[in-house]
């Protein structure tokens, strides 16, 4: 969701994350053609939820009390319900099922809030970490490493940059001596 800069990009992210089926997305896109402001409003709501979740996750990582406004935002998403929504079996996996007909677009965000709440209240919450890249990456991850000592969001991005920076500075310091 971090890179979803437009309503269409947000719908693609929701689809890629398995949170919205193509018929639902088509229904919402058609609705947005008639009411484009609704698309922008949902994107604003999604960004608001993302920022609230980030605050809660960072508070958990830092061991501090979270901003009550962030918890209130997430709780607002947790408390809503859409009759007929639930889990559907898809071969050997599960996916979110939405009712046909009128779907409140903000209901697409509900599984995100539920998943985050499950993470924050479950045993994996203690494995939640923030990337330690010096450029200020800020991405969050769950440290599943055996020693619980992972430092970067990905080794391919921030990890390699940090290691190459460290190597450069060591080589530069060695050249001076």
Predicted regions and their residues:
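Intrinsically disordered, low-complexity regions enriched in small/polar residues
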Residues: 96-98, 143, 170
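Short helix-coil boundary/hinge micro-motifs
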Residues: 1-130, 177
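Alpha-helix termini
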Residues: 31, 167-169
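A generic structural signal for secondary-structure junctions
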Residues: 15, 169-172
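BZIP DNA-binding basic region
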Residues: 107-165, 172-177
